[in-house]
Amino acid sequence: LGLYAPFVMQHALALARTFNADLYVVHAVEPMGLFAESVLQSYLDEQALNEFHSQGLKTVIANIEQRVLDSFREELGDDGEQDLQRIRAVRVLQGDPSQVILDQVHKLSVDLLIVGSHSHGVGAETPLGRTAARVLQLAKVPVYLVPLMERRRREDR
């Protein structure tokens, strides 16, 4: 997840506590690029490559989901068990991030979508990241946008 995920999660948990709501954590990863695919093809035979795509990717994604949950558990500490119970699922899905998020909004029938304005600090000078902008444009549910912390600190000066 992005650098600001814990900050976004704090907002999500505060809202969930206030409204006694459940949380679904969705993280989208871009599909494997051509370079990575060609490297795998160089070292794996066709059967091993097919097995990697079917099982290896599932294993990698399951490990990412577990690490995300573990990082939230660590972030919340011993007092956060009740907050952790609010998290119904952590889903890591491959695809275009904005489309993955919008698809999950529909599949999970969510009432409110909470997103960070940027996933990491690289685009800190732009007012809104690509994924956040696209989600804001296309979402059919209200979107709660959490601003980048660095931007807020700079503007406070």
Language model features with spans:
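Glycine-rich, Arg-bearing micro-motifs that act as flexible, cationic patches
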Residues: 1, 112-138, 148, 152-155
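Small/aliphatic-rich secondary-structure junction motif
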Residues: 1-54, 149-152
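Structural beta-alpha unit
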Residues: 4, 18, 66, 70-113, ...
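Short glycine/serine/threonine/alanine-rich loop segments
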Residues: 21-22, 110, 141
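A structural signal for isolated positions on well-ordered beta-strands in alpha/beta enzyme cores
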Residues: 22-24, 89-91, 144
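Structural beta-sheet core signal
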Residues: 25-27, 115, 145
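Short, well-ordered secondary-structure micro-motifs
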Residues: 35-38, 102-103, 125-126, 155-156
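Short, hinge-like loop/turn segments at secondary-structure boundaries
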Residues: 40-44, 107-108, 131-132
